[in-house]
Amino acid sequence: MFECTPISILATFSGTVPEPIEADFPWLSLSILFPIFGSLVVPFIPDKGDGKTVRWYALGIALVTFLITVGAYLKGYDPSQEGLQLAERVSWLPDLGLTWAVGADGLSMPLILLTSFITALAVLAAWPVSFKPKLFFFLILAMDGGQIAVFAVQDMLLFFLAWELELLPVYLLLAIWGGKKRQYAATKFIIYTAGSSLFILLAALAMGFFGGGTPNFEFTHLANQDFGTGFQLLCYGGLLIAFGVKLPVVPLHTWLPDAHGEATAPVHMLLAGILLKMGGYALLRFNAQLLPAAHAQFAPLLIVLGVVNIIYAALTSFAQRNLKRKIAYSSISHMGFVLIGIGSFSSLGTSGAMLQMVSHGLIGASLFFLVGATYDRTRTLQLNEMGGVGQKMRIMFALWTTCSLASLALPGMSGFVSELMVFTGFVTDEVYTLPFRIVIAGLAAIGVILTPIYLLSMLREIFFGKENVEFLSNRELVDAEPREIYVIGSLLVPIIGIGLYPRIMTETYIASIDGLVERDKIAIEQMLKPSETISSNKNLSLITSSTPSLTPYKVRKS
């Protein structure tokens, strides 16, 4: 083995993906359109103003949507198949190359299930909403269909439309039902996310019109195109910015603490449980799958950014005195493992990244729901004002403790398995040099050590800190009610189930992950060909990699 600086040529990597398997029943179209059309009925529901009828209606629509996605998985999805399944294709605007193309593979099916599951629980979490309940549940249901569409559509232009349309409900949910600084948080959210989305549109148009002729934006077509390496690098950089905002990647993260700081509990659940996963999914779907030559050069940067996420966000979370912002920075830290896994070029590491997205979706939703439930009782988010509430809310303390242990990756919980897979996959795979792997693993371990420190100290301060007698005497601290216990219990079942038997989840996507990693490794081999192979073709221009020089790959002598 010898070290070689990443250098690529305008010769391209031509990967192929399996042909889609057509759906016998329009499961995915139904899962997208059912909640959207269901939301349109909400304004016409007779209601006395208390929102009771609307709540039950929204819960019914959300539960049926969840059952539709479960039916899609059980009836039409084969986990052993690598390629696209449940595929539906209808020509929509042929002159523009726009097609209604949906489908699911291992990259999308787990997140489709996660979306419908979290949304149903978010509706239950929104039960106390009394201010403009019709508009609130209308937005929740519309958001459900939009988020499923992001994971299910197989046309890049359609993906952009779903990505953009999903932003409006989030903006309104923040701007209308948020805290005192809700307008600032909502505006910052829309500026960051909508502004960065321009890169998705530009990349979609460039890739769809590549080569001239009739534009084609379908993923299966784009995956088999011979994009030049320079072209891939430009598209990859723009998409990394767009998806890095949503993940989020430091330093593109500043909208998230503000959004979480002002959001209500159900919106928290949708932000942490689903919205952030859109960024990780898109990095896998577009950057890693459609642009493999560029991914081979950007992957070391993803890993470095992942470490920065883990350490910076963990240190910042440690310093926060606001409960919502503390958990928000904890989310950013955990998403750093997704970046490391995506850049690992290891089936185990990439599988760990996928599992981390699902795991964090469940754990993040549970923690933010508890944040909302605690705030409803205490009317404060400052840790130093909550001391001693554990004596009056013992069940709430037990729920907080269990979910916090899941977040700090306690063995037997899903977070432990996903982070261990990312670490093991990255360290044991020999794509990168040993010194680089050791440095990255050592730095990432700092974040792992900090997580239990700030989470356990948070629990101690909230529930068993110095009692604030005036604070406790002026508040009726009611313990967790059955609805709240049910929501947390529903989230803990898969958290513990995956932690004890990870194959429940990993088998749903491992075939797709293996195929993706295999194609990306071929791109690395082509990128790191011996220099004499490059110089043999004098008509090809050299492009020096923009990745840091401290991250050389290891290749075998030919």
Curated annotation (Swiss-Prot):
Bilayer-spanning residue ranges: 25-45, 56-76, 111-131, 133-153, 157-177, 189-209, 230-250, 264-284, 298-318, 327-347, 353-373, 395-417, 438-458, 485-505
Keyword Thylakoid: yes
Disulfide-linked positions: none
Annotated GO CC locations: plasma membrane-derived thylakoid membrane
EC annotation from Swiss-Prot or TrEMBL: 7.1.1.-
Alphabetical GO biological process terms: ATP synthesis coupled electron transport; electron transport coupled proton transport
The protein's name in its UniProt record: NAD(P)H-quinone oxidoreductase chain 4
Organism field: Prochlorococcus marinus (strain MIT 9211)
Annotated gene: ndhD
